[in-house]
């Protein structure tokens, strides 16, 4: 079983003309459920949120949840699928619930706008979800094996450094991480282990639906590493492949069981050899 901690938010995409209930927490939960993983989901929400989650229990027999009462339905609005969202209420006006305390063997945790938490577990994957004063895991959690997944801005904010050697020292020696992954959008990601670095490719897709792509990378990585027992390197590569399929088709696939993979790796163009007008 995997315990997922994260938000359940409303997402409005004007380009796709859609209003959906997802958020990082529930989208991660959805990926795991679609791949037959037993999931306990810890989130916040109002009566409508609880009704929505109960409806999903009718579809997924392996799904349980714990929902802390919260009046607001936090909303992310996108003008198009590559847009940065507008968040309502404003970040400064979002009230917080009492601290959530979760103890579980296996955890995938996403930073939440409306809640802080205390975590204790064996294997934990942590995604801070914000470059604005992201929480350090050492401030609220204990794990036997910890993997951070974050982007460049989040890594800089947590470590207060742009130097990769300082960043590595911080995560390995101060945060006691087993590994960390720094995502770089279309340029893929880098998996940092104590003894090596592994470039994780991105893939060329026919469609690019960016909304939720980071959630899928984190949740699928946790699935491959925790549930399927793959190595950190194989988990990261398969997470990137699952993300590519999600961005193209909005489906949740376990790529580790596929006989073939249809997408080509993206190679960064060498702009220094091009003439710019």
Report the location of each language-model feature:
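Short, conserved phosphate/pyrophosphate- and ester-handling motifs at nucleotide-, phospho-/glycolipid
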Residues: 32, 151, 214-215
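Short beta-strand/turn micro-motifs composed of small residues
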Residues: 6, 43-45, 128, 150, ...
């Amino acid at each position: 079983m995997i315990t997922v901690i994260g938000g359940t938010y409303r997402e409005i995409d004007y380009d796709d003309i859609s209003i959906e209930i997802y958020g990082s927490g529930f989208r991660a939960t959805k990926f795991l459920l679609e791949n037959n993983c037993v999931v306990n989901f810890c989130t916040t929400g109002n009566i409508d949120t609880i009704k929505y989650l109960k409806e999903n229990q009718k579809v997924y027999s392996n799904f349980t949840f714990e929902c802390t009462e919260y009046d607001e339905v936090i909303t992310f609005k996108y003008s198009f699928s590559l847009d940065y969202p507008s968040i309502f209420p404003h970040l400064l006006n979002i009230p917080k619930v009492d601290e959530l305390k979760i103890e579980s063997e296996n955890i995938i945790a996403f930073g939440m706008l409306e809640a802080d938490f205390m975590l204790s577990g064996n294997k934990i994957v942590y995604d801070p979800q914000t470059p604005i004063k992201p929480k350090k895991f050492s401030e609220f959690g204990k794990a036997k094996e910890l993997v951070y997944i974050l982007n460049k801005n989040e890594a800089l904010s947590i470590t207060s450094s742009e130097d990769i050697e300082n960043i590595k020292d911080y995560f390995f020696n101060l945060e006691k991480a087993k590994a960390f992954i720094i995502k770089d959008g279309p340029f893929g990601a880098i998996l940092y282990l104590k003894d090596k670095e592994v470039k994780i490719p991105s893939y060329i897709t026919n469609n690019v639906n960016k909304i939720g792509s980071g959630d899928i990378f984190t949740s699928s990585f946790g699935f491959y590493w925790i549930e399927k027992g793959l190595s950190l390197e194989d988990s990261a590569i398969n997470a990137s492949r699952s993300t590519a399929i999600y961005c193209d088709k909005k489906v949740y696939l376990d790529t580790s069981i596929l006989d073939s993979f249809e997408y080509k790796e993206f190679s960064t163009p060498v702009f220094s050899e091009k003439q710019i007008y």
